[in-house]
Design a protein with these regions (language model features):
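Active-site helix/loop of acyl-thioester processing domains in fatty-acid/polyketide metabolism
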Residues: 172-187
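Beta-rich nucleic-acid/ligand-interaction surfaces
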Residues: 192-211
Length: 213
């Protein structure tokens, strides 16, 4: 059962979200992927990343980022709805999430990052949770959310991705953000399991991180 919550119009989502999502889609679309005898039904949605429309949207959101102008959840949901048509949608969403987390990490000062690297693992986890709380405040839209610890986890009710994608593939975006953020702060590779999915009938969306072997 898919969620029926509608995306709101109040600007409360960072423009980094739609910008990185579009840039990731563009980067995954390369001319050398188009082979003779290709299945047009599959390849046409992929070519959207190289279209003039997408390039114009990327330019638009770059300007929005410069101006630090928050976006409405409805705007982001519209873009998510465009990406979920693609056969590689889950890959795009997860990679976009990783890039958002990497950007947030790199925006911290060099001194801060070096200090975090020297902290014991428990303190690193707490720092990761604090950073996640700050970041998801700008990514969750109108959804209610919380970030847990031991392990670092995320729970969102009424998430943008569940609203936009009844299939649940878009939820890979939040998995990518959470896993990469914890990876950067702890210095240990993490993945995120989507334990519950609101779009697939769960009462909420929940992601749990774990260290990769």
């Amino acid at each position: 059962m898919s969620t029926t919550v509608a995306a709101g119009a109040t600007p409360n989502v960072t423009p980094v979200f739609p910008l990185i999502l579009l840039e990731t889609m563009r980067d995954m679309d390369r001319p050398d992927e188009y082979l003779e005898g290709e299945d047009i039904a599959v390849s046409m949605p992929r070519r959207l990343g190289l279209s003039d429309v997408v390039f114009k949207q990327i330019h638009r959101f770059r300007e929005e980022v410069k101006k630090k102008r928050m976006q409405s959840p409805a705007t982001v949901v519209d873009l998510i709805s465009l990406v979920i048509r693609r056969p590689d949608a889950d890959e795009i969403f997860e990679e976009a999430g990783r890039r958002v987390a990497q950007r947030a990490w790199k925006e911290r000062s060099g001194a801060f990052r070096r200090t975090v690297r020297w902290l014991p693992q428990g303190a690193k986890q707490r720092s990761a949770r604090k950073a996640a709380m700050k970041l998801f405040r700008q990514l969750a839209g109108d959804g209610s959310w919380e970030v847990g610890i031991k392990p670092v986890s995320l729970r969102i009710t009424g998430s943008l991705t569940a609203v936009a994608d009844p299939g649940g593939a878009a939820c890979a975006f939040y998995a990518g953000v959470l896993s990469e953020l914890v990876t950067e702060y702890t210095g240990r590779k993490h993945s995120a399991t989507h334990a519950k999915c609101e779009a697939r009938g769960g009462g909420t969306c929940e992601w749990l991180t774990q260290v990769q072997a």
